Amino acid sequence: MSNIIKQLEQEQLKQNLPSFRPGDTLEVKVWVVEGSKRRLQAFEGVVIAIRNRGLHSAFTLRKVSNGVGVERVFQTHSPIVDSITVKRKGAVRQAKLYYLRERSGKSARIKERLGD
């Protein structure tokens, strides 16, 4: 029984995902339904957490919009997520960057990772 579930989950995994790590700046394009219309909405932010669980993998993006911190959790293999683009690679030494929630301005900056 579990082999059937694993096979079904394997078929639903997205194959064309870029590799990204915490600290990277991503642009995620998501399908949004407004009434009868369907359009793409872009969300650009810094990866502060990644949860690797196969089909149930997720990542959290954080951005500051009009002085307010906005965090959004995306399911990596969701059909709602249209595309993921890496805009900038960040050099950090932690897996979870929750400390960025308390920081603002220059202290919230992340150095760029070079040569990678």
Curated annotation (Swiss-Prot):
GO MF, any single term: structural constituent of ribosome
Biological-process GO terms, alphabetical: translation
Record key words, sorted: Ribonucleoprotein, Ribosomal protein
Gene Ontology CC annotation, any one: cytosolic large ribosomal subunit
A Pfam family it matches: Ribosomal_L19
Coiled coil: none
PROSITE patterns recorded: RIBOSOMAL_L19
InterPro entries reported for this sequence: Ribosomal_bL19, Ribosomal_bL19_CS, Ribosomal_bL19_sf, Translation_prot_SH3-like_sf
Family annotation (SUPFAM superfamilies): Translation proteins SH3-like domain
Biological function: This protein is located at the 30S-50S ribosomal subunit interface and may play a role in the structure and function of the aminoacyl-tRNA binding site.
NCBIfam families in UniProt: rplS_bact
Protein family: Belongs to the bacterial ribosomal protein bL19 family.
PANTHER family: LARGE RIBOSOMAL SUBUNIT PROTEIN BL19M, RIBOSOMAL PROTEIN L19
Name the UniProt record assigns to this protein: Large ribosomal subunit protein bL19
